[in-house]
């Protein structure tokens, strides 16, 4: 035909006659089309059988069309075939009201709107290039008019761009002035059309006549001007026709490539279904249908973004689709779809297309240009080019938005992921996703495994806690409010969770890694992810991609908000003790601050040194309690209640052992460890566990049920303990840095129970790695305290090596402990020698003072020098003024007994002063600081002198009469709680400080006592102890405590018999009694 009227401002190829359908039936989605004959006349209503290759390539035609003749695959007529010879393009034209005939060269069958993909135009191979210009614009107008007239059979307006995409629904095209059409056409030349027939653009920088031999016979210029003038929103039917874009989808890449490469359509066979240059040029008319802002925008952007005119897309889709499907497994739901969408989107007026679609089109085109160009050239003219699938070719028609989303995802996966580093979590997660990217299933499974390992490693080293993950995720949500981003994060989170644990049930563990992905691949997940995941990972795709609120893929009956786990009994104990420790620290600091200034009180002073000692030795923050037994106070584990399995209850409570343990062990090397830690053991354990985990995982991949029945490992104290009771564990690996929880039912008890069971069952138990490292070895993100090995078959060499290393480490540990104990014993001896007499009484380590705390407290008294005991006894007698009345009463009868007894009693009293701290556990003495004042009056200096003389005469301190005087002496000044040996030691110190005053006042005492007092004064001056009274009291209390433990009752009677004579001043003794009557017992400088 001749050029269209100028009014149309559209140059159409005169060679192509508009295709006229046999009859126009609005009800039918696709009607048999009358194809223009070569002479330009529309062939009669009689349908011409379509070549079988066309039918084969396009099997998916709606069968529900009543009007339509269904061609059999054996050359039956599916659409009316144009009379022209195959040389002319075979074009199925959308049923549009007859328009000015288009040259037969361009017979174009446009898709009829149908729920399923409508019949696509098939193009017969047309060897001759299209020389004629585009059909007159009026033809286009007529076509568009018919399209407009044609109701949307589908009831959905399919945007031009969405023909292929399942998102095809678009608003009806709004008619726009033909000027727009003109303008669009002018710009059309700017947009490189894949197939450009000899076209003359009315206006435009690119206006030039191109002769492109596009085998595609579809001519979009055949649309009626009405349609061309209408915008996408107005002409919904046109949009439906534009569904032809599906064909174009396949050809679209070719269109882009050929247009950009400048390849003429002559290069493409007509069979391939490429659009003729007319169609490319007339895609503008198709766009003109959108012509308003839509078409103009699209055409304008078509050069950059779409560039693919609607007819062009159709032709290209037809041609490229087949080979692309072959070449790319994912083309159906993947990039081809994207290309098709891009073409269609571009074909759809840019104004109508969403900004995201335009961007997607641009990106898709950029990504696909190379593919399209190569594919368009590679595409064969045979039926492959015409191969279509309903799902693939018409995804957009069937599912709106699916193909577009898929296209977006494909684009992102190809473009975004390619830019990312290979080891990035996003890349790792995405690699298994594009199943449609022609990746074999085997490769996919391998990638999944590799992904799981990579994710596990990445997250294990990152050690992101769930809280931090949630915070990260919330931040991501705040920053990226787009639902797609949320969906993507959730998808990736689910993927990571599943693969990181290498088990679908562990999806929740790897969620954090999804967050970095959220921002990078925003559009990634809607449909294509959903589809690909549905194939590979059905559990991940259970969520609704349209639901913005669904933050993560759900598995089974998993709750959106995970219900907090109730803490187990062990966890409750751990949490409780943690709180107690915090409280103790606070109380300790406050108590220490209060006690240091108030050392005058015997109780406080007694507690303080023990607190410091126990804290130093045990490393615990718990102050020693006066009510505790000496063993508990001496032990480094003076926490109440002490667990049965704790070291305190397992014989580690001796001072030497406790100091050794505290010196060797630390938080990272707890006391329950009985072997030395070494890198060799750690490496061996790591290899062994990783090997066993790999065995278990391999079995799990093959047969999950069997894998569960034949587990290799078990993690956790609870599980390990349970299986050890069942005698199923072959080896136990314990982390040496478990938290110290010594309360009953706490962590220490659980660990000692495990060790005890292992010893009973003769199971090797190894201390290696830290809790976090142990967790990593078994592919866990959380710390693991204990790992039990059910079966090490297959890794016997590693296991045997581990056992050998462990035995060597135990030997090394024993040697280390022995060496440390020896060193400490030597240090204790040196410290005892250097201790001042008033502090250590110049005796063996049995002085039990706070300084010599680690010495053997229970040293027999027989080893002590007699002189020391005599002097101590005398000093105690001096302080006996402060004896309680009851004690004095008890001591009196003893003293009245024959002289042998009194002498022994006196000696015993002196011994008691020294023994008191040692034996104080047996004595319960009430604070007698106030009482001694009254008691001292009862005691008389004569009796004391007599007792002292007896003691000097006898001179033997065998302790036979310790009973009587011991209790009285101890009770006088020491308020020691029974069993408080350390308190007695403290008393000794205070007695030393205190003793010099009372001794100065006492004049009539024995010469030895006087000498002792002078010596004590000198020592006090040298030490410059401001608190002399308390120190002396401590010493006397120690001595009295020693004897009091042995003879608690005898002291009081002896005290009664011995009463002070009025000649002697009672005050000094009373003062001594008040403050620390035991001052007499403290160390003798002699």
Swiss-Prot record:
Comp. bias (Acidic residues): 981-994, 1032-1046
Biased composition (Polar residues): 193-206, 294-303, 328-344, 624-657, 922-931, 947-957, 1004-1022
Residue ranges, compositional bias (Basic and acidic residues): 355-370, 933-943
Region (Disordered): 155-207, 243-386, 615-657, 880-904, 919-1086
List of residues that carry Phosphoserine: 276
Domain of life of the source: Eukaryota
Protein keywords: Phosphoprotein
Gene Ontology MF term list: selenocysteine insertion sequence binding
Designated name of the protein: Selenocysteine insertion sequence-binding protein 2-like
Species of provenance: Mus musculus (Mouse)
Lineage, broadest ranks: Eukaryota, Metazoa, Chordata, Craniata, Vertebrata
Gene label: Secisbp2l
